[in-house]
Swiss-Prot record:
GO molecular function terms listed in the Swiss-Prot or TrEMBL record: diaminopimelate epimerase activity
Protein name stated in the entry: Diaminopimelate epimerase
Binding site for substrate: 13, 46, 66, 76-77, 145, 175, 193-194, 203-204
EC number(s) on file: 5.1.1.7
Residues forming the catalytic site: 75 (proton donor), 202 (proton acceptor)
Residue ranges that the Swiss-Prot or TrEMBL entry lists as coiled coil: none
Subcellular location: Cytoplasm
Keywords: Amino-acid biosynthesis, Cytoplasm, Isomerase, Lysine biosynthesis
Gene that encodes it: dapF
Superkingdom to which the source organism belongs: Bacteria
Job of this protein: Catalyzes the stereoinversion of LL-2,6-diaminopimelate (L,L-DAP) to meso-diaminopimelate (meso-DAP), a precursor of L-lysine and an essential component of the bacterial peptidoglycan.
UniProt catalytic activity: (2S,6S)-2,6-diaminopimelate = meso-2,6-diaminopimelate
Any Pfam family hit: DAP_epimerase
Amino acid sequence: MTLSFTKMHGLGNDFVVIDGRQNDPALETATIRHLCDRRFGIGCDQLVLLTPPTLAGADVHVRFFNPDGSEAGACGNASRCVAKFVGGAPTLQTAAGLLPTAQDGDLFTVDMGTPRLDWQDVPLSRACDTLHLPLHDAAACSMGNPHATLFGDAFRAEALGPGLERDPLFPERANIGFAQILSPIHMRLRVWERGAGLTLACGSGACAAVVNAVRRGLTERTCTVTMDGGDLRITWREDGHVFMTGPAVTVFHGTTA
């Protein structure tokens, strides 16, 4: 099957975007894994599939797939890329809900919705205080996908990430953030992403880290999050909505053989 695609990235978090709005390719798991493979396929942190919306108010239906073929509920960096790809400040229909977007020059903002803080909604496998998990004292929330944030000055993300992602406390596995608070308006973050491993940036992980930091009184509601790939500006508004602002880049267009 021949597929047209666009390679994009947000702060080095890279994506293969397939526009199926006119003809849904109905990708199988094996095909997704192959396309995401950096040696035998195109290579990416996630594959993004666009199809026609099914909800009123949405401009495009977006699905996010990890390199292992599993589906993610949300991806902040990919959402900014989709906003650029589609144009016109689209509202995205995702498994996490409707995500409005906006553009200001080269920067794209996504309303990531409201975080879910109850243990059942993360979800966790048992009742826990999501602000202080019995797991490295992490804090947890859902941004449409499960996140846990560890706060400290030095973490070996590559060593801790795989085990924490699959800890029995997370029945759906989890994205694991390793955050260092630099000031009340600035943090350093690395994220071990569920199904993808350590990436250069994670938009939903940055949102979760700021939410969890604010809950602990560590930062203000607007915070710059510096990751290996660059900076995002995250704002957790008083009305509960989390806004993520950052760049989106088109790298090239191609067609599979």
